[in-house]
Design a protein with these regions (language model features):
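Interfacial/gating helices of multi-pass transporter permease domains
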Residues: 30-52, 119-123, 187-189
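Short alpha-helical transmembrane segments in multi-pass integral membrane proteins
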Residues: 1-9, 69-136, 182-207
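Transmembrane alpha-helix boundary and packing residues in multipass membrane permease domains
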Residues: 12, 16, 28, 67, ...
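Alpha-helical transmembrane segments of multi-pass membrane transporters/permeases
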Residues: 79, 92, 147-174, 188-195
Length: 207
């Protein structure tokens, strides 16, 4: 049991740690914004727990799928294994719909319950709304990651995470400060860079 907990727990911890890199990188860049950097940092601080909750739900669902899928494959029952994979993707779709609805209707209520600073509320709402509405990247990446691990291809999930993080690091200054033809978007730019990185990770694993 202890060995199983380690095998399943360590990848989950590493995944959450790597996903936290997105918020750390975003915070580093918005902290250097010419206007409103303090409010932006406060906004990201309020948003971070919700982001990690989405990551935890996605990874938790993936870990359960991983265990069941590995069991079916070990038994040579490929038909049930395919059904498990399909059900996990359907569940991922339900999780995304919940995040989408929260992004549309619940984000401002949540941020407003944490602060009375109107600038922080505006920035936090903008950032979190984008992350929730385009959360399919992080949700399905978490599921694809565990599906690959169950089939012994964990290296691909690591590559996907690294690619997503690199995409985020590259896009952050471009979209936050406005470089070349890209307009300055501030906190919204940080959010878009994050979700693009997450979608890139998920797309890479899907391919």
């Amino acid at each position: 049991v202890n060995k199983l907990m380690i095998q399943m727990g360590i990848p989950m911890i590493l995944s959450m740690a790597l996903q936290a890199v997105y918020n750390i990188v975003d915070s580093a860049f918005v902290g250097n914004m010419r206007v409103g950097s303090e409010a932006a940092l406060n906004a990201l601080t309020l948003v971070f727990p919700v982001q990690m909750l989405m990551v935890a739900v996605g990874i938790g669902t993936g870990v359960g799928t991983n265990a069941l899928l590995a069991r079916m494959l070990g038994q040579g029952n490929h038909k049930k294994a395919a059904k498990v994979a399909g059900n996990s993707l359907f569940l991922g779709g339900i999780i995304y719909v919940v995040c989408l609805l929260f992004g549309i209707f619940g984000v401002k209520v949540y941020i407003s319950s944490q602060t009375v600073d109107l600038k922080v509320i505006s920035m936090g709402t903008s950032y979190l709304r984008i992350c929730c509405i385009i959360s399919m990247g992080i949700i399905f990446f978490s599921l694809f990651e565990k599906l690959l691990q169950a089939t012994g291809r964990s290296l691909y999930s690591t590559i996907g995470q690294v690619v997503g993080a690199v995409v985020n690091i590259i896009l952050d200054p471009i979209m936050i400060y406005g470089i070349g033809p890209v307009p300055e978007m501030g906190v919204q730019g940080a959010a878009y860079a994050t979700v693009i990185g997450q979608v890139a990770s998920a797309a890479l694993l899907f391919v």
